[in-house]
């Protein structure tokens, strides 16, 4: 098919991280790309929202003021092991806006803090000293955790992906004799925040993947990266070789003779292209492409935004143990602004916002009892369809980038990326779909980066020899 000079080579449907990754990679490779996003901003579920005008103007209840003008739907973080997400930030020119933190404070409801950070030694011993001092756990609990982490270095290679994907992470933990307190105060907080799913519901394969890549394989894996700006600013830059069309929803794909001829937009216009990438959540992909998506379901996240009249705590963030709120993040530009996160938040979805705020404030006062901060303002954002649920058995159901149409590919964190539903997984899917386009065009290129290599003593664990399949 020959297109006019002003027509794109590739049409990408969806401006979330998967679509952004595909667009940035193909644009840099010399392809003309049109990206269609139905909303007025990029980033998909990792986006920002404008505050109501009264708050944006700094006015609330007379003399009380709130400095922030926009908020993220939910605080998003990345780990040092997210190699492809960091590569995308380099491509977008925003890598310098990500700050990494080696120390991760865990706080119990009595206000005591244990910090997980590298304290010397080769991987996987770099966090051992922190674990030995982890006050929420008894020595019996800590020894159980150490034994469980050692099993992470062996069992994925011994049993394989599909075997471990057939059981829940909770079943795996119980099979490895983890104590109830070790599960609730160590394994559960990490797993739920990383996978947006409870150990009772999530695949053991992905649970072990989190601890291998984030805790054991490489000393840089556990470092927490936080954007220094609202998420909307991360994805606001121009992408070389890419034209972005906002408020441009795709109604259907036009196809003939086993190929997609183009995308029909909501206004009736056709967007022709040689190649097309559908980079949408699974429920929206089902509207455009044939396939069985019935096995996929969602897991929600709730972001609770609180403005106090003074700082609540000093650290940039903290993991909160044993309560409903799982993490709290302090915005450095606005000391009284705290973002709280509840992942896998099914139980909170029916609750009205006022009740959710009341719960969060009450719990924050437990964790930080010495503050006299008064709440000025609050906002609750419920992401009902935040991620797909990485339940046991889903690995075999996740599709490759290929579709029934030779020139059309699909991307999204729900596809077969080798990763759980994370920002890294979304970027990996976009790069994988972009690689398929270059192959179809006879100009094959590699965009996917390998995972952080196992280093130190971790190189000798059998799990280090598992190679993630390319999507």
Q: What annotation goes with each model-predicted range?
A:
Residues 14, 100-101, 246-248, 254, ...:
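Short loop/edge segments at beta-strand edges and connector loops
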Residues 27-60:
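Glycine-rich FAD pyrophosphate-binding loop
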Residues 54-160:
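Dinucleotide-binding Rossmann-like beta1-alpha1 core, especially the glycine-rich loop
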Residues 18, 41, 283:
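Conserved Rossmann-like nucleotide-cofactor binding loop
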Residues 3, 118-119, 318, 324-471:
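Conserved flavin/dinucleotide-binding core of flavoenzymes
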Residues 144-253, 273:
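Active-site/ligand-binding neighborhood in enzyme catalytic cores
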Residues 4-6, 29, 248-373, 464-471:
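Mid-domain catalytic core of redox enzymes
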Residues 8-35:
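N-terminal Rossmann-like FAD-binding beta1-loop-alpha1 element of flavoenzymes
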